[in-house]
Amino acid sequence: MKYLDVRLPEFANEFQQVLSRGKMDMKEVSSLVQELLDEIRTEGLDALKKHIARFDKWEVKSFEDLRISPKECLNAYNQLSSELKSALHLAYDRIYAFHRKQKMQSWIDCEENGNILGSKFTPMERAGLYIPGGKAAYPSSLLMNAIPAIVAGVKEIVVCSPTPHNQANPLVLAALHLCGITEVYKVGGASAIGLMAYGCKEIPKVDVITGPGNIFVACAKKLVFGEVNIDMVAGPSEIAIIADSQANPLYIAYDLLSQAEHDEMASSILISDSAPLIESVQKHIEQILPSMPRAEIAGASIKNRAVMIYTRNLQESIEIANAIAPEHLEVLTTTPFDTLPYIKHAGAIFLGEHSSEPIGDYLAGPNHTLPTGGSARFFSPLGVEHFMKKSSIIAFSATALEEVGESCALLAQSESLSAHAQAVLTRLDSIKSKRE
């Protein structure tokens, strides 16, 4: 892991590497991804068969082979222990309750002159959710992507998830049953994104695609944007922790490792004005890491992507965190809420020593699909709004048009758009003639 000290002259250059973490160079994969997307667009099911044989190592003989039936999902759910069922239901209920508060309501404003203005919020008709299935398959990702769509009122929700060697993850199947999703396809990678974006003879296209994935999935989402809407282009997972001298180093070590075990490319960053704390955290990581089930993955992440940043004071720690704009930001200080007004850029903010980032991953309620790689400066967490669209409502009365019509025509004429102006002036003439 790297150790950076803001006091040293080389800090600025070294910190630039932290700011460029998670940046995905898609040049090397974009041509392959575009080729796969083009094949899906033109060949449909035949292309899917080729791609699945190539990447997931099993043979698709018919369209039905691609589908996961509701019965399979029910069977997987029934085979769960009662404790795991309860945990899934608890997560579902908490995530649903949080996202229900996000749902936007249509509104109309009626002015005295009869002018009516408003916004109408409508759910997307068909949403596509991508659920990873590589080194680990996450039922939590299914819940986090499906529940906002359910709350939004999306009528048709389709899920695509890879099944290497035609083996589906039973926990994901159980979560599908819990969410009531019945249209599920055993397709992964760029092929899945293409299938949902373009559709084929057997499967209609979707309106929006959400969900995390590897660089091929991210590249495919970027390429199909405009054909459909997407949530964001996300990269490897990351965490930054602001901590003072009173923070618990063992808590910090586990929270950093919780990101490192996701992926070799995950970033774990500690920002503190306490050198003894940083040293203690490093020692705890060294002690814990060898016994972790995913020690190889976590070890590679810690070795190559973990950073300890030693600052002068808490204010500087906050400034560093804002520059990083992390996916997850923990604040482990004596008075964490005092820092909240000064935090500008983070996907999710965890305040206090009991607000461990994994709580947010599973069942706190807020979504765990978050912007990465510094994109929290302009992207937001996945939410109900990603599955809804807004239409403006405009209804002018004759009186309202008379009040502003000439100004509107003048603006149109200033832009040399004569038909725009005449469309308004003709109506004004008609209103005047009726009154005469």
From Swiss-Prot:
Signal peptide: none annotated. Binds 1 zinc ion per subunit. It catalyses: L-histidinol + 2 NAD(+) + H2O = L-histidine + 2 NADH + 3 H(+). Substrate binds at S237, Q259, H262, H328, D361, E415, H420. Zn(2+) binds at Q259, H262, D361, H420. InterPro entries: Ald_DH/histidinol_DH, Histidinol_DH_CS, Histidinol_DH_monofunct, Hstdl_DH. Its cofactor is Zn(2+). Its EC number is 1.1.1.23. It is an enzyme of class 1 (oxidoreductase). One of its GO terms (biological process) is L-histidine biosynthetic process. GO terms for molecular function: histidinol dehydrogenase activity; NAD binding; zinc ion binding. Keywords: Amino-acid biosynthesis, Histidine biosynthesis, Metal-binding, NAD, Oxidoreductase, Zinc. This is Histidinol dehydrogenase. Catalyzes the sequential NAD-dependent oxidations of L-histidinol to L-histidinaldehyde and then to L-histidine. Disulfide bonds: none annotated. SUPFAM superfamilies: ALDH-like. It comes from Helicobacter hepaticus (strain ATCC 51449 / 3B1). One of its GO terms (cellular component) is cytosol. The active site is at E327 (proton acceptor), H328 (proton acceptor).
